[in-house]
Design a protein with these regions (language model features):
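Intrinsically disordered, low-complexity RNA-binding regions enriched in Gly/Arg/Ser/Tyr
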Residues: 1-42, 48-81
Length: 81
């Protein structure tokens, strides 16, 4: 299952998110989206977890949780059209 993680502090790294999500199960990948020209974080990321039940538990427990001074938005990612 692909997960959207938003409202992230700009200092958060992919390894930080990977560590948090691994508390709920296996994580295939984490990708923080950055501005092409400055390489600065846009404040959101996508993660892929193969087990839907583990991903759903992570979504339920992490959505609205505070991390690095900001309240995260965590939900199932909507595929591009």
């Amino acid at each position: 299952m692909n997960i959207y993680i938003g409202n992230l502090n700009y200092r958060v790294r992919e390894s930080d998110l990977q560590q948090i999500l691994e508390e709920y199960g296996v994580v295939y990948s984490v990708k923080i989206i950055v501005y092409r020209d400055t390489k600065r974080s846009k404040g959101f990321a996508f993660a892929e977890m193969p087990n839907a039940a583990e991903a759903q538990k992570a979504i339920e427990e992490l959505n609205q949780a505070e991390y690095e001074g900001r309240q995260m938005v965590v939900k199932e990612a909507i595929p591009r059209r």
